[in-house]
Amino acid sequence: MKLFVGLGNPGARYAGNRHNIGYMAVEAIAADHGFGPWRARFQGLTSEGRLGSEQVLLLKPETFMNLSGQSVGEAMRFYKLTPADVIVFHDELDLAPGKLRLKQGGGHAGHNGLRSIHAHVGEAYGRVRLGIGHPGHKDAVAPYVLSDFAKADQDWLADLLRGISDGAEALARGDGAKFQNAVALRMQPPKPEKPKPAAKAPEAQAPEAAPDERSALQKLADRFR
């Protein structure tokens, strides 16, 4: 079994926040791949289903961001999962809006949700870092991540979530390259080929004159008629 965790804060007040893009990612997977209804478990909401041959549990911790590790740890203990079975979707200030990167293990870079997960299960789990951009000054970070995505963000956000859903099966089986390619195809679809110019029709040639079969004497006589 794989555990896909989407980080965010519970409640309608936070639903459209940049900080909740992790929630949005697992919700898109659940909706597009026929997962079961969301149920209250492990201090969060869970939905079960399959991605290809892999059984997958989607988890949205409802502990609020700073205590996300409590929920993740509880689910892992129940299913006897290791950090290698876990992938966390989270917002990333250090990536431009719409950019996505995979990461296995490593630090939490000050992200409070990841910090909590580190404290409960260690750092060896996988992450899908979802770029939301940086407001430019550290004092502006909290209000920025707790604000809704702007109208101008909606198109790339929709494409990003579709791409994540498209590539979810590849991600579940460990094919990170194919997952990232699925996202890239949504974010930067191939340009349509330019129509080739129509081939010019060959110019009509004037019909050849019939050969003159008159004798030299006839030609001379015709000149003086």
From Swiss-Prot:
Covalent S-S links between cysteines: none
Keywords recorded for this protein, A-Z: Cytoplasm, Hydrolase, RNA-binding, tRNA-binding
Biased composition (Low complexity): 198-209
Stored NCBIfam families: pth
Subunit and interaction comment: Monomer.
Protein family according to the UniProt entry: Belongs to the PTH family.
Name used for this protein in its record: Peptidyl-tRNA hydrolase
Name of the gene: pth
